Regions:
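Bacterial N-terminal signal peptides that target proteins for export
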Residues: 1-7
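Hydrophobic h-region of N-terminal signal peptides that target proteins for export
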Residues: 9-18
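Alpha/propeptide regions of enzymes that mature by internal proteolysis
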Residues: 19-386
Length: 386
């Protein structure tokens, strides 16, 4: 995780959070399915993730100065050093949001270059910065243009979103530090200033590994969650949002806006050999994982999902024709199930990792309380051994 422009105390807090926060399973949340060794999108071989986190200032909002609570997260499907396209598909559950480059994903069936997630008003800057990075790194050898996929959620409750604090150097930093291995969660990258179900949200990840008789494939998910209202929050079937007591009087647990106005971006990666149409089907299943946590994808929510496969190298090789492999539709259902399960867990992991944050005008969003969550998991009759 790359953190820029931080107060020293906040830098220490953010670094410790990324390294030592427990994850949902450690608190007794009984998720379905078998995870990979990292329980992260990087369990899909080749996938690399980088981020830049911007935290500075406090007190009254001064547009252009702060407080700043934002950043950018990037995902390389085949790693930073490998720009070969991958098969991909996307789906919009509710379209009050943005994911650039998806018309070409839909048309071509390919995802080219890194995926980035940031705040709503930084999409253009991040998109242009990715192109500049590709130019600088000599990636335009096969074609003289790029249509990067950049998605967003709104962090304006905690962040000076109209101050445009994400800069080209921040995007380059996230791109240049992307790596395999554990993925930071919570108040990091594009998820720094996000709110989820009235609690602190952010970035989260999880994975599932299919049994050998189902192909042994891996499915990994990364989310940037900024959606839902507190009473909706459901974890492992338990109505957690209704069980947790009100926040202290000096804190705001539920933002002052009404309705389900947040958003969530979900990126699904797999090493299963799937065609673009099948990957669109996989992206649609992320909706069910989201629904498990309580969301109904309200009118003002931007719930947009992308799925890609790292299999089938050389599928776009010139001049062709090219031969590719594909999982039979009759055997694709376990991949659907894995996507649902990993999406649910990634959202909860984001909330468990996130820490209480105070941003513009003293707005405070409380973290999901770990002890209360663990207690409710133990006591709830809905929680069965899995």
């Amino acid at each position: 995780m790359k953190v820029r422009h931080l107060l020293p105390a906040l830098l220490v807090c953010a670094t410790v959070s990324a390294q030592s926060n427990p994850r949902a399973r450690a608190l007794g949340v009984p998720f379905d399915g078998a995870s990979g060794p990292l329980d992260a999108i990087t369990d899909v071989k080749g996938v690399e993730v980088g981020d830049t986190t911007l935290i500075r200032g406090e007190g009254k909002l001064i547009v252009g100065q702060g407080p700043v609570r934002t950043g950018v997260t990037v995902i390389f499907p085949r790693g930073r050093a490998d720009g070969e396209p991958v098969y991909a598909g996307w789906f919009s559950q509710n379209g009050n949001g943005e994911m650039t480059g998806t018309t070409w994903v839909e048309e071509s069936g390919f995802l080219e270059g890194p995926v980035a997630i940031t705040n709503t008003h930084s999409v253009g800057l991040v998109r242009d910065s990715i192109i500049a990075w590709l130019v600088e790194n000599g990636r335009f050898t096969q074609q003289p243009w790029s249509l990067p996929v950049v998605a967003e959620t709104w962090d304006g409750y905690l962040n000076d979103i109209n101050g445009f604090h994400v800069q080209k150097a921040d995007v380059f930093s996230a791109l240049n530090t992307a790596k395999p291995g554990p993925v930071p969660e919570g108040n990091v990258g594009g998820g720094t200033g996000m709110v989820c179900y009235g609690f602190k949200g952010g970035d989260g990840t999880a994975s599932r590994v299919l049994p050998a008789d189902a192909g042994g494939y891996t499915v990994g998910v990364l989310v940037q969650c900024n959606c839902g209202r507190r009473p909706q929050l459901t974890i492992a079937g338990v109505p957690i949002g209704k069980l947790i007591p009100a926040a202290p009087a000096n804190a705001m647990l539920e933002p002052e806006w009404k309705g389900d106005v947040g958003s969530i971006i979900i990126v699904v990666a797999t090493d299963a050999p799937l065609l673009p149409g099948q990957l669109k089907r996989l992206a649609r299943r992320a909706t069910m994982g989201l629904a498990r946590t309580g969301s109904s994808s309200g009118n003002s929510s931007g719930d947009i999902f992308l799925a890609f496969s790292t299999a089938n190298r050389g599928a776009n090789k010139e001049p062709g024709p090219n031969s590719v492999l594909t999982v039979s539709n009759e055997r694709i259902s376990p991949l659907f199930q894995a996507t649902v399960e990993a999406t649910e867990e990634a959202i909860v992991n984001a909330m468990v990792a996130a820490q209480t944050m105070t941003g513009v005008d003293g707005h405070t969003i409380q973290a999901l309380p770990h002890e209360k969550l663990a207690e409710d998991m133990k006591r709830s009759p809905q929680v069965l051994p899995r």
